[in-house]
């Protein structure tokens, strides 16, 4: 029987040291403006955010920054701040008077369907000690390179200054190398890659990383950062189909949709990746999944799929797990005989182990155990 295996990238194919380093560099940029030596959250704290469904550093950075500033302003309630983040950081630094919080806790808030976590926190009224204009500038438009100062700075560190300017046609605001190139490393060996490339196994990337548009289209790549493609090249899987954030953004732009409603845990993400894996065509997968999103029917490329196959997903968080479980159910309701397997990869992380245990998802600490455990 054919096996489709959907592969997350960060925490599954690569150790995402680049994104974590870019996160810390972005936070420390603002810390420096405040006159502080550093501002860091330990990895387990960041893993707890992922456990809550906050997977992207584009959300983590504004939420962490807002948490720090809200705590400071709760102890400086009458401090007036400009709405520009850099200017606000300088002004906050002038008024610290030696105060620094010992423990920072990001508030709980309800997620809003189709909305990114940072913006959901804003809608929920979190960080009320921060003046509204500044709060909006921190938390809103978290994927807009022109409007989000945190995203724009983070992308400098992820891509490097030169590629940042080439990708977005914007002048570099800081000079830096690409942390993706200097800090990411592969989790898979040649032996693991060979097991994944066996006959009757069909692979596709399933990631929230930015990416180029679908490889079958010939439109401009302006604003599309090829970060997912960089990772697949690093692990020796550059040729497999990929459904990443940039691909979903492209589909959303073509159809007047919100990309946030298409990305995992939305089943659109896994449906598109499943079609792409079996057909080798990213754009066909995206269009077919987009049709389901808009009509509730599996049309187009789904007609060309085998009626029976196994659907695996390997994830380090629950977003892709939920996307794939729902996609499998949609396929079965449409007459496909699909057996769904959700596999967690923890790399020994306590919070990831707890998350998968609570969700009843089988998990493994490393790829060697995973390959043996699922019988590949």
Language-model segments: what does each one mean?
Residues 1-3, 217-376:
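Asp-based, Mg2+/Mn2+-dependent phosphohydrolase catalytic module
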Residues 1-46, 52-55, 59-62, 66-70, ...:
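Active-site neighborhood of HAD-like aspartate-dependent phosphohydrolases
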Residues 1-7, 32, 62, 66-152, ...:
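Non-catalytic pre-domain segments flanking phosphatase-related domains
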Residues 5, 12-13, 97-105, 109-251:
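Substrate-recognition element of Asp-dependent hydrolases with the DxDx(T/V) motif
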Residues 15-19, 23, 53-57, 180-185, ...:
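Phosphate/oxyanion-binding active-site loops and adjacent basic polyanion-contact surfaces
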Residues 28, 66, 190-197, 275, ...:
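Surface-exposed alpha-helical segments enriched in charged/polar residues
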Residues 32-49, 70-84, 237-240, 282-289:
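Short, surface-exposed acidic
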Residues 46-49, 53, 261-262, 362:
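Pocket-edge positions in alpha/beta enzyme catalytic cores
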